[in-house]
Every structure is written in structure tokens, then in C-alpha cells.
């Protein structure tokens, strides 16, 4: 069985307040700060900034 890695699941939530989100993983050791990335929001059909949120 493989050892547990140090990657943590995160949710990227749209700043356009549409409720749309992506899920991904990130390495906490290499990127301790909150992630912000520009991705496509299909609800508003534009590229918007997505901010990191914890998965409940």
C-alpha cells in the first residue's frame, strides 16, 4: 500500500458569486499560501479568479 502523501484536497470557488467551483489538490509544503487562479466559469461564460476554500 502506498504511503499517504502531503497533498491536500482543496476547493476553488468562483469570485463571480455563481456558486461554481473546481476541486483539485495542492502540496502544502511547497505552497503554504492560499491559491488564486484564473479559470473559466461556465455560469457567466467568462474567465474569472477562483480562490481556495476548504472542502468540508
Curated annotation (Swiss-Prot):
Family: Belongs to the bacterial ribosomal protein bL33 family.
Cited InterPro entries: Ribosomal_bL33, Ribosomal_bL33_CS, Ribosomal_bL33_sf, Ribosomal_zn-bd
Species per Swiss-Prot/TrEMBL record: Glaesserella parasuis serovar 5 (strain SH0165) (Haemophilus parasuis)
SUPFAM superfamilies assigned: Zn-binding ribosomal proteins
Gene name for this UniProt entry: rpmG
Protein name per UniProt: Large ribosomal subunit protein bL33
Keywords per UniProt: Ribonucleoprotein, Ribosomal protein
One annotated GO biological process: translation
HAMAP family xrefs: Ribosomal_bL33
Domain of life per record: Bacteria
Gene Ontology CC annotations of this record: cytosolic large ribosomal subunit
Residue runs in coiled coils: none
Gene Ontology MF terms: structural constituent of ribosome
Stored NCBIfam families: PRK00595.1, rpmG_bact
